[in-house]
UniProtKB/Swiss-Prot annotation:
Top-rank lineage group of the source organism: Bacteria
Miscellaneous: The reaction produces a racemic mixture of D-glycero-alpha-D-manno-heptose 7-phosphate and D-glycero-beta-D-manno-heptose 7-phosphate.
InterPro entries: GmhA/DiaA, Phosphoheptose_Isoase, SIS_dom, SIS_dom_sf, SIS_GmhA/DiaA_subfam
Catalysed transformations (reactions): 2 D-sedoheptulose 7-phosphate = D-glycero-alpha-D-manno-heptose 7-phosphate + D-glycero-beta-D-manno-heptose 7-phosphate
Cofactor comment text: Binds 1 zinc ion per subunit.
EC number(s) on file: 5.3.1.28
PANTHER family membership: PHOSPHOHEPTOSE ISOMERASE (PTHR30390:SF7), SEDOHEPTULOSE 7-PHOSPHATE ISOMERASE / DNAA INITIATOR-ASSOCIATING FACTOR FOR REPLICATION INITIATION (PTHR30390)
Protein role: Catalyzes the isomerization of sedoheptulose 7-phosphate in D-glycero-D-manno-heptose 7-phosphate.
Name of a matching Pfam family: SIS_2
GO molecular function: carbohydrate derivative binding; D-sedoheptulose 7-phosphate isomerase activity; zinc ion binding
HAMAP family on file: GmhA (MF_00067)
Similarity section: Belongs to the SIS family. GmhA subfamily.
Record protein name field: Phosphoheptose isomerase
Length: 193
């Protein structure tokens, strides 16, 4: 009954992945992001991750697999997803939703830390403010974006951009794969300490 729709969805996902994979810059960006994160961890830094909606879930997923585990048992790495409901609701109420991530970065971000900002459009105002706050703190910035990178294009030390202009779920599918590969590479980098 829905087999054609299922095949179509899987084919579109595969095509989006193949398009991403065809650009060597994307492969290098994932590698550079993982190396930047591992260097921060080796220097006693941490990563703060943030996103909205499904990207918020990806930010939490990323932090959880760094502090917990990915595939193998190993020491946890210092990762915090900016997701505390009391912080988010307080800042949203008192300052506005555009400040929910930047206020947290201002409070706990330090020079040598890394911010991972995730936005499929690249236009999320609260992620842009978090990037600005991270820069003011001397932090490095990695972004996961989509389409043309939006307003976030060019704002990161490392940008992993999925150049898909359709629905956001295709971009998110590549983001989660990039996240998993980054964690795998971080583990390899940290094992060489």
């Amino acid at each position: 009954m829905y087999q054609d729709l299922i095949r179509s969805e899987l084919n579109e996902a595969a095509q989006t992945l193949n398009n991403f994979l065809a650009d060597e810059a994307n492969i290098l960006a994932i590698q550079q992001a993982a190396q930047l994160l591992a260097a921060s961890f080796k220097a006693d830094g941490k990563v703060l991750s943030c996103g909205n909606g499904g990207s918020h879930c990806d930010a939490m997923h990323f932090a959880e697999e760094l502090t917990g585990r990915y595939r193998e048992n190993r020491p946890g790495y210092p990762a915090i997803a900016i997701s505390d409901p009391s912080h988010l609701s307080c800042v949203s109420n008192d300052f506005g939703y555009d400040y929910v991530f930047s206020r947290y970065v201002e409070a706990v971000g330090r020079e040598g830390d890394v911010l991972l900002g995730i936005s499929t459009s690249g236009n999320s105002g609260n992620i842009i403010r978090a990037i600005e706050a991270a820069r003011a703190k001397g932090m490095k910035v990695i972004t996961l974006t989509g389409k043309d990178g939006g307003k976030m294009a060019g704002s990161a030390d490392v940008e992993i951009r999925v150049p898909h202009f359709g629905y956001a779920d295709r971009i998110q599918e590549i983001h989660i794969k990039a996240i998993h590969i980054m964690i795998q590479l971080i583990e390899k980098e940290m094992a060489s300490v």
